A protein has these predicted regions:
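Feature for exported/extracytoplasmic and membrane-associated proteins, marking the mature portion
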Residues: 1-203
C-alpha cells in the first residue's frame, strides 16, 4: 500500500509521499480494497471493475459482487453495489412469500405498497430498492435450492460455512445468469499484540 517505493532513510527524511494514515490497520485495509493509498476512497477496485462488466450478467437484481461479510469498500463501485448474503444464503423479508394465511396477507400488503406510484424521490427509491431486493432473494434462493448436494466436505467453522455458500453460488452461476463474480469474506482476529504463539494457534 505504498504510494511509491520507499526506503527507511527516505521515510525518516520525509523525502517521499507516504500512504494516508501510515501504520493504521483500518487505513491499510481500506487502501488495499480501494488501491488508492494517498486518500480515503469509498469506491474499491472490484467495484470499479463491476461498473464496467456488470452488464455481462443478465440478472439486474443480483450484483456480480457478492459479500458474505457485509459492507465493504472493495466491492463498492460508483454505479454497482454488492449483494450481501450470509453463510445460509440470501436473507428474505420475514414471512414474505411463506406458507399460511398470515404470510399471504403480509406478502400482498408488501406487494401492494411497492406497486404504488410514488412522487417523492426517497419513496420512489426505497420502493424500487425494496422490490429489487425481494426479487433478488427469490432468484438467489431458487437457484441455490435447485442444486444437487455438494460432495465437497466443509468443516463447521463460520469461515468454512461461508466458503461452502460461495461454492454453492458458483455452482448456481448458470441459473443466476452470472459470467463474472467476486466474493468478499472477512476473517478477523489477526492483530496479535501479545501471546502471539498461543493466539495464532487458535486461528
Amino acid at each position: 500500500t505504498l504510494v511509491e517505493p520507499t526506503t527507511l532513510d527516505q521515510y525518516r527524511r520525509g523525502a517521499v509521499a507516504l500512504p494516508l494514515g501510515l501504520f493504521s490497520h483500518s487505513d491499510q485495509s481500506m487502501q488495499w480494497q480501494s488501491s488508492v493509498p494517498d486518500r480515503r476512497e469509498a469506491v474499491g477496485w472490484a467495484g470499479r471493475m463491476a461498473d464496467v462488466i456488470q452488464t455481462g450478467n443478465c440478472d439486474p437484481n443480483i450484483s456480480m459482487n457478492i459479500s458474505l461479510s457485509g459492507s465493504n469498500v472493495w466491492q463498492s463501485g460508483k454505479v454497482t453495489s454488492h449483494y450481501t448474503i450470509t453463510e445460509n444464503g440470501s436473507e428474505a423479508l420475514w414471512d414474505y412469500g411463506g406458507p399460511g394465511a398470515n404470510a399471504m396477507v403480509r406478502t400482498e400488503a408488501v406487494d401492494s405498497l411497492l406497486a404504488l406510484q410514488y412522487r417523492h424521490l426517497f419513496e420512489k427509491t426505497f420502493a424500487a430498492r425494496m422490490r429489487g431486493a425481494i426479487d433478488a432473494n427469490v432468484d438467489f434462493s431458487n437457484a441455490i435450492a435447485a442444486l444437487p448436494p455438494l460432495t465437497t466436505q466443509f468443516s463447521n467453522t463460520s469461515l468454512s460455512r461461508k466458503f461452502r455458500m460461495i461454492a454453492l453460488t458458483i455452482a448456481a452461476r448458470q441459473a443466476l445468469c452470472m459470467k463474472r463474480q467476486t466474493f468478499f469474506v472477512e476473517a478477523g482476529g489477526w492483530d496479535h499484540h501479545d501471546e502471539v504463539v498461543l493466539n495464532q494457534a487458535a486461528m
